[in-house]
């Protein structure tokens, strides 16, 4: 008999451990942020958004808003508000969180018993 995972797999703020996103909401693990690798999520929680601004990114011009932890104010990434390029429209409304700004919690090894 196999036992499943215990609890949800969550990503938390690196500074204060506030819960920010669920592993199940990852769209892509292959995004590049200012300081390295990042994940694209469909949803984020316990965050505040900065002002919308036009930003030239590797994939073109977008309107984005910085994503900050609602507890400590740490900037964790950004939210895509608008993509001008038709091929980038899938990003609209989604969140990019930088890997070094979030930590995994609740990622347990799958254990077989019996």
Label every model-predicted segment.
Residues 1-114:
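A short Gly-Trp-Pro
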């Amino acid at each position: 008999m196999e036992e499943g995972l215990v609890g949800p797999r969550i990503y938390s703020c690196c500074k204060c451990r506030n819960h920010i996103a669920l592993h199940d909401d990852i769209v892509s693990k292959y995004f590049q942020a200012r300081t390295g690798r990042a994940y694209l999520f469909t949803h984020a929680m316990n965050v505040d958004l900065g002002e919308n601004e036009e930003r030239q990114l590797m994939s073109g011009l977008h309107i984005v808003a910085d994503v900050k932890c609602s507890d400590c104010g740490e900037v964790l990434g950004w939210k895509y508000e608008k993509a001008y390029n038709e091929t980038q429209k899938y990003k609209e409304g989604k969140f990019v969180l930088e890997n070094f700004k979030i930590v995994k919690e609740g990622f347990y090894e799958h254990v077989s018993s019996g």
